[in-house]
Amino acid sequence: MSRSNAHLNPLECTQQALHWIHSDTLSPDDMAALNQEVLSCFREYVNPGFLEYRKSVTTGGDYGAVEWRASGPNTLIDTQGNEYLDCLGGYGIFNVGHRNPNVIAAVESQLARQPLHSQELLDPLRGLLAKTLAALTPGNLKYSFFSNSGTESVEAALKLAKAYQSPRGKYTFIAATGAFHGKSLGALSATAKPAFRRPFMPLLPGFHHVAFGDISAMRKQVQQCQKTGDDVAAIILEPIQGEGGVIVPPENYLPAVRALCDEVGALLILDEVQTGMGRTGKMFACEHYGVQPDILCLAKALGGGVMPIGATVATEAVFSVLFENPFLHTTTFGGNPLACAAALATVNELLTKNLPEQAAIQGEFLLQGLQQLAAEYPQLIIEARGMGLLQAIEFRKNEIGYAFAKELFQRNILVAGTLNNSKSVRIEPPLTITREQCARVLKEAKDVLKKLNGTMPDENKMKEYAVE
């Protein structure tokens, strides 16, 4: 059988990669070679489409920034030696900063002892992390299922809700327009972006979407489901929509949804994959509203920016449906020792360093500054909004938002648009960001807006920044 990749030697590939992995420093020649190799690998073996969305990739495709190492809790360096202030935070994974030394130390200690679990013996850190989350999460959430990502934590939540509600004849889920819950089949059924959904239709049946923040629309949908016998098993929401554009709901919305769930016997699933672990100024965003879910989804920052881990935390009443057969829903690597070590150290960092409080303090300063800029440039900006250090600037056109992000990149500040709302540029730095760094962001943002204000009225100039 002929192989189209017969010219490739896998041993040479691994040896070349290991050379770079084990290199503390790179010579200029090594940097240039690595940069070109990575661009080639993405183009030929990963997905060339990704290069179209990188702010660092030039029109000719001859340059793309390749990250090399973290240079501090809030900064990273590329292979060319450029240092960037990270205001994207890996979409919210670096809450305790890049390469947090205490998280790394915990993982290294576990790595030296036993990297992965045997599956048959009881792994201690999984138990200790579950106990920690029971103590950390609001209300009477108690039992935890561990996975490897946010979409997996949502899948587990949906399956858990189905297992609990199916004997009660309830199979329907209600989510929100603008929602993002992941891209695996079940999570995608709750996600609302048409571009992500259409190629995989039909998705799972029994999902409805209503306007986020509109309790009247939610109640009408529940009532309509009841009229047709499609009783609601669960309502799944993000307390604040992240990929929808950092949409903060009315203050009474989540309490009203909680009351509606109690009224009709539906479960409330809150997806705090992005809003959890101190991001919004409290450990969990639902705490701003005094609301406790029946099932809570966590991931992203739970691993401290060192290990991937997801968690689905539920009340005993709900989780007990898995007691009889704990193998109904499992995953090989979920709750592995390295991930649990990272998560335990992350929680410790958040608590001992008061990082949720820091997010509230620095977030208030940053948001006030962004809102002042929005008032100065209403022709460009609709509004700046957010909570804690989950913030967004919504521009009047997609092209303006992309141009803003690209100009900030040229000034060595990383930001990005949100997946479901291209006009909204998110600002989501590590919770360790300093006041001085926040001030730098505001200064550079003001300079960029001043520049764009002079160029954006010319539609021909805007084509340079357009994203098809």
Swiss-Prot record:
Molecular function GO terms recorded: diamine transaminase activity; identical protein binding; putrescine--2-oxoglutarate transaminase activity; pyridoxal phosphate binding
Its EC number(s)? 2.6.1.82, 2.6.1.29
What keywords tag this UniProt record?
Aminotransferase, Pyridoxal phosphate, Transferase
Report the record's Gene Ontology biological process terms: L-lysine catabolic process; putrescine catabolic process
Could you say which residues bind pyridoxal 5'-phosphate here?
150-151, 274, 332
Q: Which residues carry this modification: N6-(pyridoxal phosphate)lysine?
A: 300
- Catalysed reactions listed for this entry: an alkane-alpha,omega-diamine + 2-oxoglutarate = an omega-aminoaldehyde + L-glutamate; putrescine + 2-oxoglutarate = 1-pyrroline + L-glutamate + H2O; cadaverine + 2-oxoglutarate = 5-aminopentanal + L-glutamate
Keyword field contains Acetylation: no
Note the InterPro entries from the entry. Aminotrans_3 (IPR005814), Aminotrans_3_PPA_site (IPR049704), Class-III_PLP-dep_AT (IPR050103), Putrescine_aminotransferase (IPR017747), PyrdxlP-dep_Trfase (IPR015424), PyrdxlP-dep_Trfase_major (IPR015421), PyrdxlP-dep_Trfase_small (IPR015422)
What pathway does the UniProt record associate with this protein? Amine and polyamine degradation; putrescine degradation; 4-aminobutanal from putrescine (transaminase route): step 1/1
Cofactor(s) needed for function = pyridoxal 5'-phosphate
Tell me the function of this protein: Catalyzes the aminotransferase reaction from putrescine to 2-oxoglutarate, leading to glutamate and 4-aminobutanal, which spontaneously cyclizes to form 1-pyrroline. This is the first step in one of two pathways for putrescine degradation, where putrescine is converted into 4-aminobutanoate (gamma-aminobutyrate or GABA) via 4-aminobutanal. Also functions as a cadaverine transaminase in a a L-lysine degradation pathway to succinate that proceeds via cadaverine, glutarate and L-2-hydroxyglutarate.
Q: Which family does it belong to?
A: Belongs to the class-III pyridoxal-phosphate-dependent aminotransferase family. Putrescine aminotransferase subfamily.
State the name under which the record lists this protein. Putrescine aminotransferase
Q: Which organism is it from?
A: Pectobacterium atrosepticum (strain SCRI 1043 / ATCC BAA-672)
